[in-house]
Amino acid sequence: DNNVLLTGDVIHTDNQLSYESAAFVMQGDCNLVLYNEAGGFQSNTHGRGVDCTLRLNNRGQLEIHSANSNTPVWVYPRSVNTVRGNYAATLGPDQHVTIYGPAIWSTPAAANIPRVRNVLFSSQVMYDNAQLATRDYSLVMRDDCNLVLTKGSKTNIVWESGTSGRGQHCFMRLGHSGELDITDDRLNTVFVSNTVGQEGDYVLILQINGQAVVYGPAVWSTAA
């Protein structure tokens, strides 16, 4: 997805993350620039490399690499107290880039599937057949109270919460501890991911590899 950078992904020269009018661009002059309506952000690395690329490492840090050097041109945040794992940088509706992680929950990895876009942030909810969607995949909070991950057709179920018929007018919410829960209209909890992290901001990303993954808490943001 063009608004998400995951650990192991690479943004090449003159490519970008984008969300509506905002863009996070790895420019040809080796400068990383966030163009938005709130002052933006830049790495101030123009002229310090050639054919530069942007990566997100397994400590939740952004790295700029030059084709003519084995040492990163730029690493940010410079000092982090994070564990190794899988992180996610998202360009969100606030027009800022925020790094979340490490991943604390996911649907099972699908086998032999190609490696499209949507995210749910802490405190946001999904209900009445609302969904996160990618090229081939959809994560749908169905009106029968079942949370379902499908590929292609609505009947091709990759994963489900198994809560069909267990409540009425159910909604799914991502909490500020990274826990996903499904609740009915009487506020009875019918499903919980049982993945409680430290208090903070989390994000659920439906990735293009067919996994829905919760990352967090947020470890850095251009809004800081």
Curated annotation (Swiss-Prot):
* Disulfide-bond pairs as recorded: C30-C52, C145-C170
What is the role of this chain? Mannose-specific lectin. Has weak agglutinating activity towards trypsin-treated erythrocytes from rabbit but not from human.
Judging by the UniProt lineage, the source's domain of life is: Eukaryota
Domain annotation Bulb-type lectin: ranges: 2-111, 117-222
Relate the assembly described in the record.
Heterotetramer of 2 domain 1 and 2 domain 2 chains arranged as a dimer of domain 1/domain 2 heterodimers.
Q: Misc remark for this entry?
A: On the 2D-gel the determined pI of this protein is: 5.18, its MW is: 48 kDa.
Query: Under the GO molecular function aspect, what terms does this record hold?
Result: D-mannose binding
- Protein name per Swiss-Prot or TrEMBL: Mannose-specific lectin 3
This protein's UniProt keywords: Disulfide bond, Hemagglutinin, Lectin, Mannose-binding, Repeat
Q: Name one GO biological process term.
A: response to other organism
UniProt keyword Cell membrane, yes or no: no
Which residue spans traverse the membrane? none
